Swiss-Prot record:
The keyword Transcription regulation applies. The modification Phosphothreonine is found at T455. Changing K539R: No effect on suppression of BAX-induced apoptosis. One of its GO terms (biological process) is positive regulation of transcription by RNA polymerase II. Keywords: Acetylation, Activator, ADP-ribosylation, ATP-binding, Chromosome, Cytoplasm, DNA damage, DNA recombination, DNA repair, DNA-binding, Helicase, Host-virus interaction, Hydrolase, Immunity, Innate immunity, Isopeptide bond, Lyase, Methylation, Multifunctional enzyme, Nucleotide-binding, Nucleus, Phosphoprotein, Systemic lupus erythematosus, Transcription, Transcription regulation, Ubl conjugation. This is X-ray repair cross-complementing protein 6. Residues 573-607 form the SAP domain. One of its GO terms (cellular component) is DNA-dependent protein kinase complex. Residues 277-341 are annotated as: DNA-binding. The modification N6,N6,N6-trimethyllysine is found at K570.
């Protein structure tokens, strides 16, 4: 009997997606709670097209290249997010409310190759001329009207949005210096946007005499409490500086789930679970229709094998053979079997940090931070708990249930103290590292071959080699070369480039530099460790383990018909292992699948008939 989880499910169905998102939010699931939406608001006045030297890019060129970089990264990481490009300070206008000097180039939609190519036509000298012919330059704009147009773009979107942001690119620090009424309306409109959950980020560019943010934009932009203020107040003079600033603002902190931490029956606080490190993977392949090259939507239907009729979810049930009887389970019963506990963290006790060993590591840890959305006052109690755990050097042991249908984990909440750099900027946030603890079956005894201990002289020589090869390691300095080349190939296909850009493999060792540093240490180490006649390129003879015989094979196990019938009648056939069941099916010429349940059904049906 088949399951019912995917009845009439259509992948890509937007209505189903919205319903699924609401259900996942209610259950504390990991799935996203909506789409990110981002509007690039670019100043198109004449000053943005003037560079301070011939070798430098114009502020407008830097802005366009930054926007293209975000488009490409969004296509790779989250292609369901919504992006838009709006120019203000243009001679011509194009917007839904017919405001002057505002040109909406791209409305909020998914990023794609066509949009990147559309931006590409405005780069360089030829792009500047094309922009002049297509839109022109104007100065009689109102920033409040510009923000109004952006707010309308957000309101026209039918999807559920988790974050709504505007990135403003400009090199004009006082746009309404001669018109206090326009400046006042702009400040009011920016406050209205902030109240409705729309955040405005300033990407200010270098101008002659410097960019003074206090003249106007200090009251306009939105700054979170935990944000790096240097990112806001540093003006960008180079493309690398602007890219760094945009990347710092592009990614929003998104909780994997928001759960309740139960300290006891009466005291509950709400926390957010965050994933600080995520392994980068290739995106999954998408099935396309051969004739039109459009994505294929998968639909699942269940039919009766005897009549060919369509089965509804109420027509099917789950079954399990136990004790020679077929046990029928209803849908509610199977769901109840999967449900162990409500999503959340249950405090079980405290243990000293010294009891947490390195070999207890199972998987990357998560990060726990207080949330005020579910329980008001959680931050205060969370902070008190963190301080006491740091003082007493203990970890909180908890039972962690991430979702309703997931078995609970035993975890240790390891306290983490806040760290600041020399300029009092937060480097490490305060909170708890959620460390997954192993179960008994996760700990195994691994057979180790007997090793020959190194002599003190050999150890000393290796220490000297390691000391020579030391360098400052930064994880963000090394990229996965396979992934980088994969994305460059996709970029070349999407943008119709002649050939993809070759990715540099930064993981390869710098052999020449290493040899120069080590000098004669390598040869000295070889003389100490390896015998004189050692050939590193020679074939190594594989040693056989003591328990391995010379060509001995596992004998086949045969079962008599009476023995199998006895087990079937007593309902003990399920005690047989899968290899034993396969051998029995093979002996009687029975065709069956690879699963144990299918093997049991084949043997039972054969002997009962």
């Amino acid at each position: 009997m088949s399951g019912w989880e995917s009845y009439y499910k259509t992948e890509g169905d937007e209505e189903a997606e919205e319903e699924q998102e609401e259900n996942l939010e209610a259950s504390g699931d990991y799935k996203y709670s909506g789409r990110d939406s981002l509007i690039f608001l670019v100043d198109a006045s004449k000053a943005m097209f003037e560079s301070q030297s011939e070798d430098e890019l114009t502020p407008f060129d830097m802005s366009i290249q930054c926007i293209q970089s975000v488009y490409i990264s969004k296509i790779i990481s989250s292609d369901r997010d919504l992006l838009a490009v709006v120019f203000y300070g243009t001679e011509k206008d194009k917007n839904s409310v017919n405001f002057k000097n505002i040109y909406v180039l791209q409305e909020l939609d998914n990023p794609g190759a066509k949009r990147i190519l559309e931006l590409d036509q405005f780069k360089g000298q030829q792009g500047q001329k094309r922009f002049q012919d297509m839109m022109g330059h104007g100065s009689d704009y109102s920033l409040s009207e510009v923000l109004w147009v952006c707010a309308n773009l957000f309101s026209d979107v039918q999807f559920k949005m988790s974050h709504k942001r505007i990135m403003l690119f400009t090199n004009e620090d006082n746009p309404h210096g001669n018109d206090s009424a326009k400046a006042s309306r702009a400040r009011t409109k920016a406050g209205d946007l902030r109240d409705t959950g729309i955040f405005l980020d300033l990407m200010h560019l270098k101008k002659p005499g410097g960019f003074d943010i206090s003249l106007f934009y200090r009251d306009i932009i939105s700054i979170a409490e935990d944000e790096d203020l240097r990112v806001h107040f540093e003006e960008s003079s180079k493309l690398e500086d602007l890219l760094r600033k945009v990347r710092a603002k592009e990614t929003r902190k998104r909780a994997l789930s928001r759960l309740k931490l139960k300290l006891n029956k009466d005291i509950v606080i709400s926390v957010g679970i965050y994933n600080l490190v995520q392994k980068a993977l290739k995106p999954p392949p998408i099935k396309l229709y051969r004739e039109t090259n459009e994505p294929v939507k998968t639909k699942t239907r269940t039919f009766n094998t005897s009549t060919g009729g369509l089965l509804l979810p109420s027509d099917t049930k789950r079954s399990q053979i136990y004790g020679s009887r077929q046990i029928i389970l209803e849908k509610e019963e199977t769901e109840e079997l999967k449900r162990f506990d409500d999503p959340g963290l249950m405090l079980m006790g405290f243990k000293p940090l010294v009891l947490l060993k390195k070999h207890h590591y199972l998987r990357p840890s998560l990060f726990v931070y207080p949330e005020e959305s579910l329980v008001i006052g959680s931050s205060t109690l969370f902070s008190a708990l963190l301080i006491k755990c740091l003082e007493k050097e203990v970890a909180a042991l908890c039972r962690y249930t991430p979702r309703r249908n997931i078995p609970p984990y035993f975890v240790a909440l390891v306290p983490q103290e806040e760290e600041l750099d020399d300029q009092k900027i937060q480097v490490t946030p305060p909170g708890f590292q959620l460390v997954f603890l192993p179960f008994a079956d996760d700990k195994r005894k691994m057979p180790f071959t007997e090793k020959i201990m190194a002599t003190p002289e050999q150890v000393g020589k290796m220490k000297a080699i390691v000391e020579k090869l030391r360098f400052t390691y930064r994880s963000d300095s090394f990229e996965n070369p396979v992934l980088q080349q994969h994305f460059r190939n996709l970029e070349a296909l999407a943008l119709d480039l002649m050939e993809p850009e070759q990715a540099v493999d930064l993981t390869l060792p710098k052999v020449e530099a290493m040899n120069k540093r080590l000098g004669s240490l390598v040869d000295e180490f070889k003389e100490l460790v390896y015998p004189p006649d050692y050939n590193p390129e020679g074939k190594v003879t594989k040693r056989k383990h003591d328990n391995e015989g010379s060509g001995s094979k596992r004998p086949k196990v045969e079962y008599s018909e009476e023995e199998l019938k006895t087990h079937i009648s007593k309902g003990t056939l399920g005690k047989f292992t899968v290899p034993m069941l396969k051998e029995a099916c093979r002996a009687y010429g029975l065709k069956s699948g690879l699963k144990k349940q299918e093997l049991l059904e084949a043997l039972t049906k054969h002997f009962q008939d």
